[in-house]
Amino acid sequence: MPSRVRPYLRAIQGARVMFRNWLPVLARFTIHKFGLTDVTDGEVTVKCHNGGAIQIPLSTLRVLLYAWKIGLTATVDCTTGRVILLHHDNVDGDFNIAITPLDRLTTEDAVPDAVRNGWVFDGTYWRRYINGKGVVTFWHMYGPLLEVFDNEELRHVHVKGMDVVDVGAFVGDSAIYFALRGAKRVIAVEPHPVAYTEMLDNIRLNNLEDVVTPVNAALASKPGKICIGNVTVASTVTTYHAPSGHGGGDCEDEAPAVTLGELIEKYGIQPGEAILKMDCEGCEFDVILNDYEHVRLFRELIFEHHADFMKRSLGELLSRLNTDFNCMQVSGGEGIGIIHCTHR
């Protein structure tokens, strides 16, 4: 059997195991998936093997089928509205498990990959054992947690004993990662109000209040305001929060914009003794090209560039950075990717 066919057969098997009416459920999903309806999402009625029926969003059904596709076992309980996701750990012989409300899968579609990677949901928190570092704990599951802790996309920087300015700190995942790797202090900058509040909770859950300093703001080359807009927590990781007035129009939800100079002065960051991390969906162009005098003060940089989204060239950034840094792309390509730079 071709390897590319096997995952889809698992998804069909999963539908048969989860639902008594698996055939019409799959038909409804297929019609939606291939755009054969004008409805962008919608719901489907599923009938569980333990009795009862429940309506779930098609986006939730997609996550359930994906779970089976990647090798998890999913069991749906129509009575409680919960799903049990189970994955056998072939290394340790243990089971990774998550028992979660079905509606939570709609906003946390990274859940199947998390369970497969070793995360466990105890009904309240997501936890994962990190070799040599203990257990990390988070309120919700998002894709960036897997990128940071499972893929270790930020492993290239040497943070032990250093100050780290973490721009685009989201819910604290990267800040907590840096703290566990021995950072002396992490200044975690996040403009989205709900993501920022969740970051505060996650910092407390991991007992890192003495290491991580949260800042509810965005980074820019000039002080002022940036526009948040009507963006969810999950969507903010793929949204460029532009300075207010950028592109015209009013903005109902704003957050303060801070500069590197302000952060350096306020927190006593010493030149040559700090790391700058940026994952701010485009602000790297503004900061590197328009505030380079402060960028060059950092010992190492690691940032995700978004050249395609910003309709700019990666070469613009590298031409400026190559004045003082040795830079290399550690993942991605010309359109989007992660750049690591060390000061000469």
Named regions from a protein language model:
Residues 1-344:
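Phosphate/nucleotide-binding beta-alpha loop and adjacent structural elements of enzyme active sites
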